[in-house]
Amino acid sequence: MHTCKMDHSKHTELVPMLQQRLRSSGPEGTPLGGRYGILLSFTGTVERDIVPHLLQLAERSLATSGCSRKEMKRVLFVTIEAVQNVIHHGYIDPSGDIALYLTLENTPIGFQVHCGNWMATSDAAALSERVSHLNSLNHAQLRKLYIDVLCNGEQSGNQGNAGLGLISMAKRTRGPIEFVAEPPKDGVQHVTLTATIEP
């Protein structure tokens, strides 16, 4: 994980900025009622001890959506890995905080987990490369890569080698993981990771 210099006065604005992005990130015209829509949204600073609480809220929301138990487990697993990825690689401000927004949405193509945060530019570039590599693999190749990393250990310096969490996420999404990074500013850039869990 990298740290970088940034105007300290801007750090207090990170969470409000994420809140604004969350409000503007949903598809236009999405109805509030009916089967589809946002089931869970969270914006704030994140620590390891908040993960169980987020999962509990996500599980309750999924239970009311009518999804199967098997599907719920897959969605919760992807949610865990998305948040853990932020904890491990997110930008840490001088106060020691990591800002995050997380949404869980039920869409016509499946459940979507959207996770947004700030990252140091070098970390964002490395994550983009890992996600791109995983998206190029089929399920059998992902399984082989998972076993290789599990047996040989994670070597983040190897090109194309991703951590077990990201590999597991890719295996469960049954589709490409979307990764969007905005232009960097002061060595930090906003990134959004979206994973779709198909029925």
Language-model features, listed with the residues they occupy:
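Conserved beta-strand-loop-beta-strand hairpin that lines the nucleotide-binding pocket
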Residues: H2-L22, P27-S41, H89-P199
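Functionally constrained cores in energy, signaling, and assembly domains
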Residues: T79-A82, C115
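Conserved short strand/loop->alpha-helix "switch" segment adjacent to the catalytic nucleotide/phosphoryl-transfer site
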Residues: Q56-I80, G153-Q159
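Charged, alpha-helix-enriched surfaces in structured cytosolic catalytic cores
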Residues: D49, K70, L164
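STAS-typified acidic loop motif
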Residues: I38-P52
